[in-house]
């Protein structure tokens, strides 16, 4: 089917060839035929079958691809950097990019950044041929350079460490950056991406939990930077909103919920692998049990957090910061089928939800294409096959980490920073079977009780230092609590 662009009084409308236009109207049209495109201009009118015909006064000029990109007839591919490309988020991002590019060339992978997985990075480089490769661990930097020599006619810019990450963030050839680095380490790359006015597809909830007010300050300074949530629940909330309203503001800004008419958020959770266990059974679970998530395939840290439901607690704080929603208006709901990922109740009390199978490719894709959507070949949702959707409230007795997260969030100040840091230590101790299930919440609770509120620095640089110091203090305190308990 031929496609045209009509320009009336300097306004552009994209349409197809059977649109009725007024007889003898002055118009300019772009006609696409196979691999060629032409611009027609002059006096156009409808034929008897309502198809566009051209009078003798029309002229035609052949266009090149660059002309079409410049006027918007063909969209320029989105240039993407993926930080943590060998992790769960990174590999999912590359999977959906690969599949979408089979339909239409939508994405260019411009940069890949990993911690130390040199062989996996090499394989990704062979396929996607990015302009930049960066490895954080300097000890394998030379190995990466030698491996890349095996790729014929490929000469990327090979970087390492934080300096390499900063160079990628500052590149003018990159439009969007996927932050798939977990834990507090992801904050650095998020910060530098914002400082370079990038659109950040953020999967690192710890950045927002630990430094939400710092990121808000940065986003106010760097006006063109945006954070688009990748977490399935927060992507679901974001997808439920009216883009016309979203475009008037951005995530992590005051009055976001007011502008978007948000009244309440229902934050959905699978419940994790321990949802049906008794208190006595929970006392004896191991990390091996926790890593068997019933629905999602994720990294170890987030899978443990899902089992304790601390992941949902962190997401409550993330929801508060991202969408400017009061903690009393965020409700956690266990939805074991994982079809509805979250719901938004608006001020008129209507509720909109986003639904799909538990698959991170959808939220990752939306974070890259927003405010648009593109065609995919993903499996369509079959509601008849799903059949039943269930919901219930989680037990705070069985999952005390949720309660701790609400308490830390409501206290504000640096309590979410302390919560996140102490959880990193407790999570790792449980992962290595050094503590029991309920010891996780016990350690976190003791660290929170030991912390005293501090005055928040006004200067952005000083505030970042303050967050780092408190994060380090909380990790040390959690480790100290474990060591004292272990030695007694």
From Swiss-Prot:
Q: Could you say which residues bind NADP(+) here?
A: 86-89, 115-117, 206, 299
Annotated residues for binding of Mg(2+):
231, 233, 315
Instruction: Tell me the organism's taxonomic lineage.
Output: Eukaryota, Sar, Alveolata, Apicomplexa, Aconoidasida
Q: Whose protein is this, by species?
A: Plasmodium falciparum (isolate HB3)
**Compartments reported by the entry:** Plastid, Apicoplast
- A Pfam family of this chain: DXP_redisom_C
Q: List the disulfide bonds.
A: none
- One Gene Ontology CC term in the entry: apicoplast
* Family per record: Belongs to the DXR family.
User: What is the protein named?
Assistant: 1-deoxy-D-xylulose 5-phosphate reductoisomerase, apicoplastic
Q: How is the cofactor bound?
A: Binds 1 divalent cation per subunit. Mg(2+) or Mn(2+).
Q: Which UniProt keywords apply?
A: Apicoplast, Isoprene biosynthesis, Magnesium, Manganese, Metal-binding, NADP, Oxidoreductase, Plastid, Transit peptide
């Amino acid at each position: 089917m031929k496609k045209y662009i009509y320009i009336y009084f300097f306004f552009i409308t994209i349409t197809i060839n059977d649109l009725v236009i007024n007889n003898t109207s002055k118009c300019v049209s772009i006609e696409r035929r196979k691999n060629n495109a032409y611009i027609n201009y002059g006096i156009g009118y409808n034929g008897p079958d309502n198809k566009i015909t051209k009078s003798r006064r029309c002229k035609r000029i052949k266009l090149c691809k660059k002309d079409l990109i410049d006027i918007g007839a063909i969209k320029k591919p989105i240039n993407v950097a993926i930080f943590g490309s060998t992790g769960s988020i990174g590999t999912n991002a590359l999977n959906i990019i690969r599949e979408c590019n089979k339909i239409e060339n939508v994405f260019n992978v411009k940069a890949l950044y990993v911690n130390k997985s040199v062989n996996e990075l090499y394989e990704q480089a062979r396929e996607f041929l990015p302009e930049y490769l960066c490895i954080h661990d300097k000890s394998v930097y030379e190995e990466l350079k030698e491996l890349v020599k095996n790729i014929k006619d490929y000469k990327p810019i090979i970087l390492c460490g934080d300096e390499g990450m900063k160079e990628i963030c500052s590149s003018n050839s990159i439009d969007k950056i996927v932050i798939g680095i977990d834990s507090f380490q992801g904050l650095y790359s998020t910060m530098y991406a914002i400082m370079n006015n990038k659109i950040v597809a953020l999967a690192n909830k710890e950045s927002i939990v630990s430094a939400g007010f710092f990121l808000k300050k940065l986003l106010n300074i760097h006006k063109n930077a945006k954070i688009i949530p990748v977490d399935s629940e927060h992507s679901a909330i974001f997808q439920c909103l009216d883009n016309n309203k979203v475009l008037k503001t951005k995530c992590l800004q005051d009055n976001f919920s007011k502008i978007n008419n948000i009244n309440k958020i229902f934050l959905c959770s699978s419940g994790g692998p321990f949802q049906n266990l008794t208190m006595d059974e929970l006392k004896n679970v191991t990390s091996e049990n926790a890593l068997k998530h019933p629905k999602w395939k994720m990294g170890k840290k987030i899978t443990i957090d899902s089992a304790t439901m601390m992941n949902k607690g962190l997401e409550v704080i993330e929801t508060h910061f991202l969408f400017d929603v009061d903690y009393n208006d965020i409700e956690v709901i266990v939805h074991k089928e994982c079809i509805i990922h979250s719901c938004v109740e608006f001020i008129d009390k209507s509720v909109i939800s986003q639904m799909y199978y538990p698959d991170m490719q959808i939220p990752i894709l939306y974070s890259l294409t927003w405010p648009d959507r593109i065609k995919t070949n993903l499996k369509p949702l079959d509601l008849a096959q799903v059949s039943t959707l269930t919901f219930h409230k989680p037990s705070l007795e069985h999952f005390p980490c949720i309660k701790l997260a609400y308490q830390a969030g409501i206290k504000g100040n640096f309590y979410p920073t302390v919560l996140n840091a102490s959880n990193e230590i407790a999570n790792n101790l449980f992962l290595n079977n050094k503590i029991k299930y309920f010891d996780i919440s016990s350690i976190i609770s003791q660290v929170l009780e030991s912390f005293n509120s501090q005055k928040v620095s006004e200067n952005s640089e000083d505030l970042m230092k303050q967050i780092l110091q408190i994060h380090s203090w909380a990790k040390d305190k959690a480790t100290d609590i474990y060591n004292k308990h272990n030695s007694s």
